């Protein structure tokens, strides 16, 4: 007489159904990642053409485009320290074809202003591309030749000096406010919609100083049109070995590092996020790309979505606390 184990058969059937269901859930994402991308990709930059973020995006677009096999279109959407660009990306389809290429203010905007969106829920990190210290630059005709001379001048003439920023809440803004606090100087904030117009007015002598990123500031320092007084990193820049850090002047905790990274709309398939992140990581590891970046005073990063998330959490914690403690505003 043949005995049938109905319990075992039922369990095997249930497991088979579960396995098929899991496979069915994975296959569409895998297929989507394999098919992605099949049309041009748009990178939205929150600042004006010609500034540091714009230049960095365009530099990275070429190798990433080759790796993905599709053209990359860089679109500038300046205004409100990145808010307008972020909104445009959030409202785009969550398919990986529209990314935000943002920078330092992303981590402090939620502390500085009331936003019409949640930057930590409506956007997801893809990859941090680069890091770079700022360079404190002044017009070549400025009366002060060194960092300490500028501080002495500022202390002797309270409120006379002003400083440019590429937008409220950016690294140039917070670096200047940190210096106000640490060095005891009084100077006036003049915000611009991007680094390019800030540099233009600095060259014309319309503003006293600017914590420029290397992309926009370094060429003018090297040509003698601007004077570099200090840099904001933990160590001297390879591209400017003779320019001291702010730390070297006795401000041992002073460090401000600009960064650029990619974000996608929430809901973008993880497989697509991973594909995009891998392309950025691979591009920043290419010897020729690294050589160009380092020569511009930039540190290539290229990390995973989770590593970028961890970095952002640290930035939000540090700068959020500082903004609140020192009552820094967007004004």
Residue ranges and their predicted role:
Residues 1-9, 13-26:
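N-terminal secretory signal peptides
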Residues 131, 217-285, 317:
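C-terminal lobe and pocket-closing loops
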Residues 101-106, 195, 212-217, 232-234, ...:
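Beta->alpha turn/N-cap motifs
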Residues 27-33:
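Sec/Tat signal peptide C-region and signal peptidase I cleavage site
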Residues 50, 104, 139-144, 166-170, ...:
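Short coil/turn segments
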Residues 33-122, 160, 185-208, 213, ...:
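N-terminal (or domain-start) structured segment
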Residues 38-40, 181-185, 222, 248, ...:
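An extracytoplasmic/periplasmic, membrane-proximal ligand-sensing/linker region
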Residues 91-97, 110-197, 246, 259-292:
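Hinge/capping helix and adjacent helix->loop/strand transition within the periplasmic-binding protein
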């Amino acid at each position: 007489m043949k005995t049938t184990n109905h319990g075992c058969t039922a369990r095997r059937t249930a497991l088979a159904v579960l396995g098929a269901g899991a496979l069915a859930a994975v296959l569409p994402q895998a297929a989507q990642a394999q098919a992605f991308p099949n049309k041009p990709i748009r990178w939205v930059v929150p600042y004006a053409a010609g500034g540091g973020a714009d230049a960095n995006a365009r530099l990275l677009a070429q190798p990433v485009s080759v790796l993905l096999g599709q053209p990359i279109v860089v679109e500038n959407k300046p205004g409100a320290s990145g808010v307008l660009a972020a909104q445009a990306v959030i409202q785009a389809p969550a398919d990986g074809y529209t990314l935000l290429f943002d920078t330092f203010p992303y981590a402090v905007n939620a502390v500085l202003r009331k936003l019409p969106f949640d930057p930590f829920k409506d956007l997801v990190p893809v990859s941090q591309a680069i890091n770079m210290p700022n360079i404190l630059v002044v017009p070549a005709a400025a009366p002060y030749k060194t960092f300490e001379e500028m501080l002495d001048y500022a202390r002797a003439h309270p409120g006379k000096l002003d400083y440019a920023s590429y937008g409220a809440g950016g690294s140039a803004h917070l670096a200047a406010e940190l210096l106000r606090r640490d060095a005891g100087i009084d100077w006036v904030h003049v915000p611009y919609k991007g680094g390019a117009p800030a540099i233009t007015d600095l060259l014309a002598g319309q503003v006293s100083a600017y914590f420029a990123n290397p992309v926009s500031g370094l060429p003018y320092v090297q040509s003698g049109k601007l004077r570099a007084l200090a840099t904001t990193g933990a160590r001297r820049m390879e591209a400017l070995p003779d320019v001291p850090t702010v730390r070297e002047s006795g401000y041992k905790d002073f460090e401000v590092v600009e960064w650029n990274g990619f974000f996608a709309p929430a809901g973008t398939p993880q497989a697509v996020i991973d594909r995009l992140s891998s392309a950025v990581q691979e591009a920043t590891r290419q010897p020729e790309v690294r050589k160009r970046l380092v020569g511009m005073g930039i540190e290539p990063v290229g990390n995973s979505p989770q590593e970028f998330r961890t970095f952002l959490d640290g930035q939000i914690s540090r700068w959020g606390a500082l903004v609140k403690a020192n009552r820094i505003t967007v004004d």
